[in-house]
From Swiss-Prot:
Similarity-based family: Belongs to the cucumovirus movement protein family.
InterPro entries, alphabetized: MPV
Protein name stated in the entry: Movement protein
Function: Transports viral genome to neighboring plant cells directly through plasmosdesmata, without any budding. The movement protein allows efficient cell to cell propagation, by bypassing the host cell wall barrier. Acts by forming a tubular structure at the host plasmodesmata, enlarging it enough to allow free passage of virion capsids.
Domain of life according to the entry: Viruses
One CC-aspect GO term: host cell plasmodesma
Species of origin: Cucumber mosaic virus (strain M48) (CMV)
Keyword terms of this UniProt record: Host cell junction, Transport, Viral movement protein
Main location group: host cell
Gene Ontology BP annotations: transport of virus in host, cell to cell
Compartments, as annotated in UniProt: Host cell junction, Host plasmodesma
Pfam families, per the entry: 3A (PF00803)
Length: 279
């Protein structure tokens, strides 16, 4: 009779608490800096013409070596059942454009295994985003845990790959990609349900929606008129001033910046949206 159970037990075992030594390797100040500098964890990566293909491993090389050494020593001593696995439940990428919507170009984003020379997308989890579709949120879910091994001269782990296509004539930054994930390490591994890569298009933020009232426009015009030197410009007819004000109230412009800490600043602060990773 075929086994009808699930692998939940393995999942519970693989999520067991790690040792203090491993915690120090992963969360020391030096390790955290390397995660940011080498892997761009939680940082904005700019896609430029001179960096058309970006491969960002989810574990820095030095940290990978220390983790692999920790598990290997425990395995050789008979204290651990394997040489270690890397588990990443989900990778979330926030993507925004930094050029006009008229620019013809796209980004191809996927999760790869550095143990694969071809760097093919894991389980075909790949997303293509056209420039005019941005901003967007993209998510990936690996279906297996990656062994902490060295293949040739490559330290095997998951990596986020971003390819830039098109954007003819644009040599500077055309898009910004901010990736977040939480890597876990254990001596036991598992396989997981296949889930297609997720893509959610996000509506651009309308920052003028709360600042189009006539009162805001009137304050802008008044502040501009008050800054004019009377010795250079003299308003000889008050009717002209009134007409200018009434016409300006129909305009759809943004109010001027407000000094931080003022009562007006706190009022305008409430108009700002809740944002995630710069979206």
């Amino acid at each position: 009779m075929a086994f009808q159970g699930t692998s939940r037990t393995l999942t519970q075992q693989s999520s067991a608490a790690t040792s203090d030594e491993l915690q120090k390797i992963l969360f020391s100040p030096d390790a955290i800096k390397k995660m940011a500098a080498e892997c761009d964890l939680g940082r904005h990566h700019w896609m430029r013409a001179d960096n058309a293909i970006s491969v960002r491993p989810l574990v820095p090389e030095v940290t990978h070596g220390r983790i692999a050494s920790f598990f290997k020593s425990g395995y050789d001593a008979g204290e651990l059942c394997s040489k270690g696995y890397m588990s990443v439940p989900q990778v979330l990428c926030a993507v925004t454009r930094t050029v006009s919507t008229d620019a013809e170009g796209s980004l191809r984003i996927y999760l790869a295994d550095l143990g694969d020379k071809e760097l093919s997308p894991i389980d075909k989890q790949c997303v293509t985003l056209h420039n005019h579709d941005l901003p967007a949120l993209v998510s990936f879910q690996p279906t297996y845990d990656c062994p902490m091994e060295t293949v040739g001269n490559r330290k095997r782990c998951f990596a986020v790959v971003v390819e830039r296509h098109g954007y003819v004539g644009y040599t500077g930054t055309t898009a910004s990609v901010c990736s977040n994930w939480q890597a876990r390490f254990s001596s036991k591994n598992n396989n997981y349900t296949h889930i297609a890569a997720g893509k959610t298009l996000v509506l651009p933020f309308n920052r003028l929606a709360e600042q189009t009232k006539p009162s805001a426009v009137a304050r802008l015009l008044k502040s501009q008129l008050n800054n004019i030197e009377s010795s250079q410009y003299v308003l000889t007819d008050s009717k002209i001033n009134q007409n200018a004000r009434s016409e300006s109230e129909e305009l759809n412009v943004e109010s001027p910046p407000v000094a931080i800490g003022s009562s007006s600043a706190s009022r305008f602060e409430s108009f700002r949206p809740q944002v995630v990773n710069g979206l």
